[in-house]
Amino acid sequence: MIPPKQQTALKITPEGRIAAVSSPLPSLQDNELLVCVKSIALNPFDAKSAEMSPTIGATLGCDFAGKIVATGSNANDFNFSIGDRVCGCVFGNNPNRLDNGAFAEYVAVPADLLLRIPEHMDYNEAATLGVGLATVGMSLYHCLRLPMKPEQAGKSPSGYAAITTCSPHNFNLVKSLGATAAFDYHSPTCGRQIRDFSSGNLWYALDCITDTRSMAVCYEAIGPSGGRYLSLDPFPIRGHTRRSVKPNWVLSVTMYNQPIPWKRPFKRDACPQDLEFAKSWFQIAQRMIDAGEIRPHTSDVKAGGWNGIPGGLELLQKGEVSGRKLVYEVASH
């Protein structure tokens, strides 16, 4: 298959809207593979970045699954071939590279940050993996520095028990995925319940919501000797109520080793050590996927293709998506 010169891509227009437009394909760098996108998945980052840091002309989207159609000059060292089914994530709404994003017919991806799709998994399922796996790796094993032994991947590799918060209707789901216990984050006693359940031994907290209420739950749940708190967004300073707890937040797109010229606190310099970690983490993640130890997120496959995606982003912005990931088929499987 010879890729065309033009493609459909979902971009931020000069009027500030999100629209499907005709656009050139991304230029392929030496270490990259060109993937024909079959399915994409939406993430909160897609909605937040487009709203808070929109870049005119940028291609949106991070999560994708598709088939390799071209290789860069140095990408053959990674044992990928034309026609391989792959998935992963890229830096969508990237001010450094307007021509590349997952919400397009073709996406350019570093070969060492790409995952091979196992035979038992379809494109819709695979499209949900990239951002979630990248965020888990950057959060737990890079920022919080939990121990990770590659040979134990898929077998409680960190030696820690996972306690989670969610809505009660998702309790069975998270427990089926390995959570030791689940608590209702709507409850005013949620933090205290977790602290009692863990006998005051909770040391690490990862806050996927990041507001004053979720931060208060995490701080109350952490044991009396203190611990470490990590959020997926900049945390409210007024929520830092315990000196014994060390707070931080993670921006996973630093793993691409590119400067991020957004406004503070999102502005970052290039970070080569984050890229090196990501390379090693994706190798571990691939082994876990191959062993069947990674289950794709519950997906909700929506209709509408490219034109339906803006509506899905609105659902995320309104907080109307719970316990599932919105997926769109954008090409025939």
Swiss-Prot record:
SMART domains: PKS_ER. Coiled coil: none annotated. Belongs to the zinc-containing alcohol dehydrogenase family. It is an enzyme of class 1 (oxidoreductase). It comes from Emericella nidulans (strain FGSC A4 / ATCC 38163 / CBS 112.46 / NRRL 194 / M139) (Aspergillus nidulans). Keywords: NADP, Nucleotide-binding, Oxidoreductase. This is Trans-enoyl reductase apdC. Disulfide bonds: none annotated. The gene is apdC. NADP(+) binds at residues 45-48, 167-170, 185, 232-233, 321-322. Substrate binds at residues 131-138, 252-256. Gene3D superfamilies: Medium-chain alcohol dehydrogenases, catalytic domain, NAD(P)-binding Rossmann-like Domain. Pfam families: ADH_N (PF08240). Its EC number is 1.-.-.-. Monomer. Trans-enoyl reductase; part of the gene cluster that mediates the biosynthesis of aspyridones. The polyketide-amino acid backbone preaspyridone A is first assembled by the PKS-NRPS hybrid apdA. The assembly of preaspyridone A is initiated by loading of malonyl-CoA onto apdA, followed by decarboxylation to yield the acetyl starter unit. The growing polyketide chain then elongates into a tetraketide. The adpA PKS module catalyzes three Claisen condensations, as well as beta-keto processing and methylation. Pathway: Secondary metabolite biosynthesis. InterPro entries: ADH-like_N, GroES-like_sf, NAD(P)-bd_dom_sf, PKS_ER, Trans-enoyl_RdTase-like. Induction: Expression is positively regulated by the aspyridones cluster specific transcription regulator apdR. GO terms for molecular function: nucleotide binding; oxidoreductase activity, acting on NAD(P)H.
